Amino acid sequence: GDPQSIPYAQKTIQNLLESKIPIFGICMGHQILSLALGLQTFKLKFGHRGLNHPIGSNTNIEITSQNHGFAITNNLSINKKVFLVQINYNDQTIAGISHRKYPHFSVQYHPESSPGPHDSKHLFLHFIRIIQITKKYSYL
């Protein structure tokens, strides 16, 4: 669905951003986090559906499961709050972002799903580390 159709979710995330509570957005959570950070979404001509979507960075490629019809507009050069972490190699859309200052990141796919439930395990381990660090230095 269209993440802009649920402004209350965006407002909730904006409130969480201000509290600096760690956030890991997945799929629509990625889109809502992006909107809360000032990025924009757009409707894909053909949605990303299925189990064979290559995403990655210069050093790492993963095959992911995806099911969405919207994506984030690539205007990261304007928005200095976040940086690009991953792209979708099929169409160059944004597949992952991270906040420059606070413990927030998100991905535009399902790391908990097939093709391999352990392929993206590093994301969950990263989130656990962020929680542990945040707890230690308590932003809360």
Regions from the PLM with identified roles:
Residues E18, S77-I78, I133:
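Secondary-structure boundary motif
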Residues E112-L140:
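Acyltransferase
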Residues P103-Y109:
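Short FAD-binding loop at a beta-strand-to-alpha-helix junction that anchors the flavin cofactor
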Residues G1-I63, A71-N74, P117-D119, L123-H126:
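Cysteine-nucleophile active-site neighborhood
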Residues C27, H68, H110:
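Active-site glycine-centered loops adjacent to acidic/histidine catalytic or metal-binding residues
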Residues N60-Y102, L140:
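Catalytic beta-strand/loop cores that center a nucleophilic Ser/Cys/Thr
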Residues G1, P111-E112:
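Acidic beta-to-alpha connecting loop that harbors the catalytic carboxylate
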